[in-house]
Amino acid sequence: MLNDFTGADKVYIACGSTDLRKGIDGLARLVQQQFELDPFTNTLFLFCGRRRDRIKGLYWEKDGFILLYKRLEQGAYQWPRSESEVKVLTPQQYRWLMEGLQIEQPKAHRPVTGLTTV
């Protein structure tokens, strides 16, 4: 479910590690107080533990929160380490993260704009 989550307008990741003992209220408070964002929007917020092998997702669904949890059996997420920062992800970056890749792919093909024929 988390790998192909498409219900949210935006996806934010909390960079660095988060204490995953926090539940819905603790994570929602973190979103509001530390990142100054509104958790009651159509947004998926992702948090990663210290070992980077598990993540939690917080999502508001019109009448209540959904708390998602995923633990990898092997490997680790390529999670940005800078503390107290939140980043918005593009759909492509979200797919990369769920596939175990870094969200910043310097060698990825960039979209071409302003084409003309010769």
Task: Please state what every model-predicted region is.
Residues M1-V118:
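Polybasic/polar functional segments that serve as interface/processing modules
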